[in-house]
């Protein structure tokens, strides 16, 4: 009862074909593949961006403290 048999999967597949039609399912899968490819390309673009260059010059700030307490 807990697992689905082959007949259950065939019925689900038949219902999906009736709802979406024969041409719509490959189109949906193509859109999913394009989305995944675009996501991977975006992730690779982020990794190729060089980190900002760090400044090698140091700064010294001089300040005299107020001695009136």
From Swiss-Prot:
The Tat system comprises two distinct complexes: a TatABC complex, containing multiple copies of TatA, TatB and TatC subunits, and a separate TatA complex, containing only TatA subunits. Substrates initially bind to the TatABC complex, which probably triggers association of the separate TatA complex to form the active translocon. It is a single-pass membrane protein. It is found in: Cell inner membrane. Residues 60-69 have a biased composition (Basic and acidic residues). Belongs to the TatA/E family. One of its GO terms (cellular component) is TAT protein transport complex. Keywords: Cell inner membrane, Cell membrane, Membrane, Protein transport, Translocation, Transmembrane, Transmembrane helix, Transport. Residues 41-69 are annotated as: Disordered. The lineage of its organism: Bacteria, Pseudomonadati, Pseudomonadota, Alphaproteobacteria, Hyphomicrobiales. Its main location: membrane. This is Sec-independent protein translocase protein TatA. It comes from Rhizobium rhizogenes (strain K84 / ATCC BAA-868) (Agrobacterium radiobacter). The gene is tatA. It holds the Pfam family TatA_B_E.
